[in-house]
Amino acid sequence: MAHKKGGGTTRNGRDSESKRLGVKVYGGQVINAGGIIIRQRGTKVHPGENVGMGKDHTLFALTDGKVAFVIKGALQRQYVTVVPA
């Protein structure tokens, strides 16, 4: 006869992989055209001048230049722009 009872089971033990979201290039830093500025879910930050937005809301530079973050508008939205160097 077995001297130990059968081990229990658990319904946990899973976790999703991290998605590596966030700011990749900060204000004042230089970026090349096509470089990713922010990976995000939804439009936490909106695209400004010389910035494009991918279908997953990723913001990327359309030209070479310096990254700048600005808050504007009645809704106090945050925008990211690329100032050509």
Curated annotation (Swiss-Prot):
Protein's recorded name: Large ribosomal subunit protein bL27
TM spans (from-to): none
Annotated GO CC locations: cytosolic large ribosomal subunit
BP GO annotations: translation
Gene3D superfamilies xref list: 2.40.50.100
Family, as annotated: Belongs to the bacterial ribosomal protein bL27 family.
UniProt cross-references to InterPro entries, sorted A to Z: Ribosomal_bL27, Ribosomal_bL27_CS
Annotated organism of origin: Herminiimonas arsenicoxydans
Region feature (Disordered): 1-20
Keyword tags: Ribonucleoprotein, Ribosomal protein
Pfam family, one: Ribosomal_L27
Gene Ontology MF annotations: structural constituent of ribosome
